[in-house]
Structure formats: structure tokens, C-alpha cells
């Protein structure tokens, strides 16, 4: 929504799952003068179309931003039945392979520019896994937005989804599972809607509620994939594989239930530091909720992310 002046370029490629064609885009400055490349992954049950303000701000600051509608989301979804479904098995691996394809496109478009990888919410778990699976690719920093800490329920979640999938089918959508997964998220807030936890920006929350392509229920197979992603990026192996000298920024609202109100992000960042990672930074914004890129203080967040990239990547010796 709104009038945006940045330029765009579209791409399509087959998902590694063979379920759909992935739709991806590049947004870049009107004058074509690109200072750095940002590869950003959106979150669960949403799509790239929600990021217009972010994309305009970053194009104005000189970035070429690459995003794709994740498999089973937005335009990367062939039928309503495919929404929130990544495949009968190994869907989480397909998600990571689809990101690798977008990385290759972005790198091909800008072979000489510094690249930063980033993800919001579920996208942060995907990009955290991506960082450890592909530590030798040519990216200069990682930004994890609205991510979570160690989740003791992830193992149970995977087991439950396996059972439900076997009994009800992989595409079964369990309201019980959804309610359990997001239990308590909204208790902290006004209760104006069921998703007040997303943002203090009521217009943004209302847009989410009104958007048919947002807020849908995941299939049990996809919940299993999400659980596996969380297990992978919470494992000892993850901390061992993430490059020790990679600049890493965690960005979250202090009132974000996904990050356990900041405690989860602190736990991950502290463990990274304890395992020899020397360039870890945390930005927590008082009062802000989960969708920190669609918050009342988002312009401040955008400036802070740009400042991090400028210092850690563009001015780095």
C-alpha cells in the first residue's frame, strides 16, 4: 500500500520442494546507486507485500533488497490448500534451499557489493539455520529480527506433529496446535484484536487482520518443519558452525512475546559470546512488540540497522 518510488525487478524459480514456483523481487534505489545488498526473509503466515515502508526506506538509504514469498505464502502458493505447507517431509530443507537460490540471484546481480542476510520471526529461524549451513558463502553480516531463544517445547512439537500427521494427514490444520503454539502471546496486551502482540501500530495490526494472505493456520507438517528449524538453530552444532568473526545483530521489541520479552534474545546472544563469537550486538526497543519493522518507532529501527551495517560492513577494514 502507498506510493513507493523505489525500482523493482521480479524473479521466479521452482521451489526445491517442487510444490510451487517461488516469486521473488529486488527493490533498489531510483538512481541505481547501490551501496550494499540486503537479503531479507519474511515471517510466518505473511508475505513480502507487507514490507513496503521498510523497502522504500532501505532503497532511499542505498540498498538493493531481495525478498521472496516463502513457499506456501503469498504468490509462492499455487492453491489455498498449499498455504502453510512445505511438503510431506523435509519441508524445512526446501525452505533453506529456496533461500540459497535467492542468494545466488542476488550475488549474480551484485557480484562486487557487500551482502547482509536477515530474517524476521520464522524467517529469523530460517536465516539462523542458513548462516550455519552456509558459513562459507559471501555475506558480511547477519541480522536476526524478532527471533526467539531456546524453546523446550520444540522437541515435543515435532513429536506431536508427527503423530497428528500420521493420523490426520500432513495437510491437516490443527487449531489446537495453533492455540498451543501462540498460547499467552496476547494476554500481555489490550485485547482489541487477537494479534495485538504484533505491534503498537493499530493500523498495521488491522491490515494484518484484514489481509486474507496473513494469519492462516499452518498444516501440521509445516508446524513440524518450524519445530525442526528451531531445534537446529538452538543446537550446540549451530553455535559451533556460525563463523566466529561474523557481525551479528539481534533486533527486537522489549514487549515481544516471541523473544520472551527480550530474555530469549539475550540467551542466544550471551551463548554466542560464550562460544567465541566476538561481534554480537543486541538492540531491544522499550515498548515495542513483535513486528519491530512495522512499529510506531520503525524509522528509528531502520536507522539503527543502517548504522550497524555501515559500521560493521561498509566501514570495516
Regions inferred by a protein language model and the residue ranges of each:
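Conserved alpha/beta-hydrolase
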Residues: 57-81
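Alpha/beta-hydrolase active-site loop
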Residues: 87-107
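Active-site glycine-rich loops that stabilize anionic/oxyanionic intermediates
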Residues: 42-46, 254-255
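Alpha/beta-hydrolase-fold enzymes
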Residues: 118, 127-213
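N-terminal cap/lid segment of alpha/beta-hydrolase-fold proteins
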Residues: 6-29
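Alpha/beta-hydrolase fold nucleophile elbow
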Residues: 110-121
Amino acid at each position: 500500500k502507498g506510493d513507493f518510488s523505489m525500482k523493482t525487478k521480479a524473479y521466479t524459480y521452482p521451489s526445491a520442494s517442487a510444490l510451487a514456483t517461488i516469486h521473488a523481487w529486488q527493490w533498489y534505489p531510483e538512481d541505481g546507486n547501490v551501496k550494499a545488498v540486503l537479503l531479507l526473509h519474511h515471517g510466518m503466515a505473511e508475505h513480502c507485500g507487507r514490507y513496503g515502508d521498510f523497502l522504500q526506506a532501505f532503497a532511499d538509504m542505498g540498498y538493493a533488497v531481495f525478498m521472496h514469498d516463502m513457499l506456501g505464502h503469498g504468490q509462492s502458493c499455487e492453491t489455498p490448500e498449499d498455504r502453510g505447507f512445505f511438503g510431506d517431509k523435509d519441508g524445512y530443507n526446501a525452505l533453506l534451499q529456496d533461500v540459497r537460490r535467492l542468494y545466488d540471484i542476488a550475488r549474480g546481480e551484485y557480484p562486487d557489493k557487500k551482502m547482509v542476510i536477515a530474517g524476521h520471526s520464522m524467517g529469523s529461524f530460517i536465516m539462523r539455520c542458513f548462516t550455519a549451513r552456509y558459513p562459507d558463502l559471501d555475506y558480511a553480516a547477519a541480522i536476526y529480527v524478532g527471533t526467539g531463544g531456546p524453546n523446550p517445547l520444540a522437541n515435543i512439537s515435532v513429536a506431536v506433529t508427527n503423530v497428528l500427521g500420521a493420523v490426520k494427514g500432513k495437510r491437516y490444520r490443527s487449531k489446537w496446535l495453533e492455540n498451543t503454539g501462540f498460547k499467552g502471546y496476547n494476554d500481555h496486551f489490550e485485547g482489541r484484536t487477537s494479534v495485538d502482540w504484533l505491534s503498537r501500530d493499530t493500523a498495521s495490526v488491522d491490515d494484518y487482520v484484514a489481509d486474507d494472505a496473513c494469519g492462516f493456520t499452518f498444516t501440521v507438517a509445516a508446524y513440524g518443519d518450524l519445530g525442526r528449524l528451531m531445534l537446529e538453530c538452538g543446537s550446540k552444532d549451530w553455535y559451533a558452525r556460525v563463523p566466529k568473526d561474523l557481525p551479528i545483530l539481534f533486533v527486537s521489541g522489549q514487549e515481544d512475546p516471541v523473544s520472551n520479552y527480550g530474555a530469549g534474545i539475550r540467551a542466544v546472544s550471551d551463548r554466542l559470546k560464550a562460544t567465541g563469537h566476538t561481534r554480537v550486538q543486541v538492540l531491544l526497543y522499550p515498548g515495542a512488540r513483535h513486528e519491530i519493522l512495522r512499529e510506531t518507532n520503525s524509522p528509528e529501527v531502520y536507522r539503527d540497522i543502517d548504522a550497524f551495517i555501515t559500521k560493521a560492513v561498509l566501514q570495516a577494514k
